[in-house]
Amino acid sequence: MSRSVLQPSQQKLAEKLTILNDRGVGMLTRLYNIKKACGDPKAKPSYLIDKNLESAVKFIVRKFPAVETRNNNQQLAQLQKEKSEILKNLALYYFTFVDVMEFKDHVCELLNTIDVCQVFFDITVNFDLTKNYLDLIITYTTLMILLSRIEERKAIIGLYNYAHEMTHGASDREYPRLGQMIVDYENPLKKMMEEFVPHSKSLSDALISLQMVYPRRNLSADQWRNAQLLSLISAPSTMLNPAQSDTMPCEYLSLDAMEKWIIFGFILCHGILNTDATALNLWKLALQSSSCLSLFRDEVFHIHKAAEDLFVNIRGYNKRINDIRECKEAAVSHAGSMHRERRKFLRSALKELATVLSDQPGLLGPKALFVFMALSFARDEIIWLLRHADNMPKKSADDFIDKHIAELIFYMEELRAHVRKYGPVMQRYYVQYLSGFDAVVLNELVQNLSVCPEDESIIMSSFVNTMTSLSVKQVEDGEVFDFRGMRLDWFRLQAYTSVSKASLGLADHRELGKMMNTIIFHTKMVDSLVEMLVETSDLSIFCFYSRAFEKMFQQCLELPSQSRYSIAFPLLCTHFMSCTHELCPEERHHIGDRSLSLCNMFLDEMAKQARNLITDICTEQCTLSDQLLPKHCAKTISQAVNKKSKKQTGKKGEPEREKPGVESMRKNRLVVTNLDKLHTALSELCFSINYVPNMVVWEHTFTPREYLTSHLEIRFTKSIVGMTMYNQATQEIAKPSELLTSVRAYMTVLQSIENYVQIDITRVFNNVLLQQTQHLDSHGEPTITSLYTNWYLETLLRQVSNGHIAYFPAMKAFVNLPTENELTFNAEEYSDISEMRSLSELLGPYGMKFLSESLMWHISSQVAELKKLVVENVDVLTQMRTSFDKPDQMAALFKRLSSVDSVLKRMTIIGVILSFRSLAQEALRDVLSYHIPFLVSSIEDFKDHIPRETDMKVAMNVYELSSAAGLPCEIDPALVVALSSQKSENISPEEEYKIACLLMVFVAVSLPTLASNVMSQYSPAIEGHCNNIHCLAKAINQIAAALFTIHKGSIEDRLKEFLALASSSLLKIGQETDKTTTRNRESVYLLLDMIVQESPFLTMDLLESCFPYVLLRNAYHAVYKQSVTSSA
């Protein structure tokens, strides 16, 4: 070979190693995806499982790599039909195999060139050259092993080539070589052992250079502990001194990578194991550390069995086989416990490191090496555990299950976050280091070189100039640094000075190599911090161990002490995209989706766990709040009364009931209650949720706190509805006051969450409670508004209509009446002032408005029925309207009326509903006056100062505003709206108006019939009648006001007409002699007074003109006297 060929600068070893290593990873990615696709029935090429092609595939595989298309027409007939589709769909697979073959050719060529050049390899001197050389060999080896694991490789290649032959009349030009390669590498390691015989010298030299690096890295946890490894505070006096080493890049070199180099490397050049004790010791040490190696992603290689199978057929290798068996036994027995102790040490070491750096981030400058060493060590241990999790020995399974792995990952993430956050601090430090120290030392080294060729001199001078020109101002100005060119030049220089005939041999100038390696590390601290983090702490391998990943997460959540570190798992999902490669862009989407789904699942589970803890705390607090309800004090009062009256309280020895609050009395601080445990667990988990405000995974931003907020909203909604304890079958429901107490207790707990997590709990309250004021929530589920509205309408008010409950104006509540069938609830406990106020607090103005609208709908249906009754009696009522001053004629006409009792009953129902509404409105006004007094007073001013001449539309708008605030109005806007919707298209407005007038006439002339009802007796104690006819006053006034507002009539005139008719009709019963007909005459007389008192349009003077006041006075006297008599 001529001298020009051997010129190192012309061989471009550095460039070729860089390109081939990158291309090798790309090829591994593509092969890995082909293997996974072929192993998945859903993703497998359809031609491999097509029943029609089954015989053809079997024939092709059997004959592979030979091609026979002429004599097998029957078997290949189906193939002929689908040849174009096969060519199209298998092209990607086929040309990937072709690319692997070409890659192999390039690697073999480069390895031959390196052998010819007799390149010197030493990981401690020419680090980049040696590392890239060893990486290339391992990538090549892994590629061929992975290729041999694709079972369908012959079928794919053969199918494609047969389709090509049928289409083009000849085989693909690459097929003969490709087919032969597939056959040759059936047993890849065996073939490569033969292939690497000429490369043994170079490879063994590179591997033996690890003798100072690998054993130092592969120490036990006790040795690390004794050496105070990674500790910044073990020697405070040297804390500010820069962490230095002669082999800087070797300090954070992956142990996993070194073990692959050693194990595969010495298998390929196995001869050295018999002649060199150092090589043998290295190999045995690596074999004792693991049971399997990671080939690529989740593809593992069982080293002991494979090595034994390879050596068993080699003569004279019995000793090596025994060594392998001994190492296997050592690995099975001791590797698990050794790595467990390492992880235990690293947890405490990384915690210390992260804590010190968070307090003094300036130490990231001098101690940056410690950070990357810590990350690399921890990453190696995690990957070791991950690949052994599915390959663990049964004897020591506990060593392979680490429930504290989350803590280690968390501290790794914390260190990564420090590096990203304080990058500029590190840049300032190392820019000064490079310009003020490294440039000076390198310049001296170069000056002292005895021989320095021109090319090498130019490169090193450029190094010095580049470093000298650096300044802190560049960092302050935010200038982007880029030392990639300088690092590539050093890589080239390593190649130039490591060949056998180099004028300047790096082997003779080791100090130069070590100094340059240190400088390269310093440059990376300025411009490649992100790349350094990926190199030393990338855990994207978890993407391919989904089951183990999820299991670790579940273990983390189940252990309360570890739940604070659970955020580490979603953070790991941010690593996943770093495992993609540009040679396989099609997998980016798949890996991206997986990272998103896992991140989403982890955050969702964390939020659910926190939500469940909060729910448990809320349940406990609701129970404690429930103990303070007034209903629970009855027993205490009873005991006090009995004690005062010196009565026996019960049997001796009866335990005294614990009073609320006793749970807060602690006799011993060691006693931990269930509530304490829940709060501790919650604070731990919330620390994790609050750890980062957001994280970016594949260009998607995740906000952990929003997950918690979302879950709290959903659970709070369900809890509020659940706490109503509504039972549709039995029509039971919680009292509003009790629900309000529970909701307030729940809200108090939720507010305390803000002490743990920075979430806007007020937003949660607004979203949930506002939805509860509507008929349905955002998920279409019923709310407390709809539940309580239905209950009051369908249960309470229906029982009022059935005569089981009466409205007591004196108590402002509905009260159960004594009946044969006792009701399941006490109406007073649901309708008194405190309960209605609680209801108003819960439902708010919107909910109360919905309640009112529902009540009005029921009223409108009753009015519709009343109008039908009026239409039936329209002629009689028309005559009665004009004949009220003719008693005989009125009596005759009254007898012709039908459905008198129905009219009164329906009007009473309307009155009851309106009475209930007035209670609700009053409660709403009280609640709003407490919460927003100034706004309510402003609304009152609007309402009280509407000029009489104001347009009715304007007035109705003011009334609507006032009604929403719970203020009583002369005309009820909700009732007007409800009755307006009843207008019939077939009836003219004049006719509608006439029906409205006649309805009032009907009610007026029907009132005397009430006197004959036994239940119509007025009770002064309740200020009403037990059959609720006192509610007629409200019904008459509000129905009249609404109807005549709709029909634009005079409300006052119509009510005067009503009063005249009613008084005339009632005066007639004064002349009746039948005691049955007049038994409650005085009680019915009082209705007139109630109607006038209730009306804003009628006056007592007007009543006096129609009905003598003396009769009213006597009526009041009579009913009170009767009440006293009946009480006695």
Curated annotation (Swiss-Prot):
InterPro entries hit by this protein: Nck-associated_protein-1
Pfam family, one: Nckap1
Modified residues (N-acetylserine): S2
Coiled-coil region(s): none
GO biological process: apical protein localization; apoptotic process; basal protein localization; cell migration; cell migration involved in gastrulation; cell morphogenesis; cell projection assembly; central nervous system development
Source species, domain of life: Eukaryota
Assigned keywords, A-Z: Acetylation, Cell membrane, Cell projection, Host-virus interaction, Membrane, Transmembrane, Transmembrane helix
Stated family: Belongs to the HEM-1/HEM-2 family.
Subunit structure: Component of the WAVE1 complex composed of ABI2, CYFIP1 or CYFIP2, BRK1, NCKAP1 and WASF1/WAVE1. Within the complex, a heterodimer containing NCKAP1 and CYFIP1 interacts with a heterotrimer formed by WAVE1, ABI2 and BRK1. Component of the WAVE2 complex composed of ABI1, CYFIP1/SRA1, NCKAP1/NAP1 and WASF2/WAVE2. CYFIP2 binds to activated RAC1 which causes the complex to dissociate, releasing activated WASF1. The complex can also be activated by NCK1. Associates preferentially with the first SH3 domain of NCK. Interacts with NYAP1, NYAP2 and MYO16. Interacts with TMEM132D. (Microbial infection) Interacts with human cytomegalovirus protein UL135.
Protein name: Nck-associated protein 1
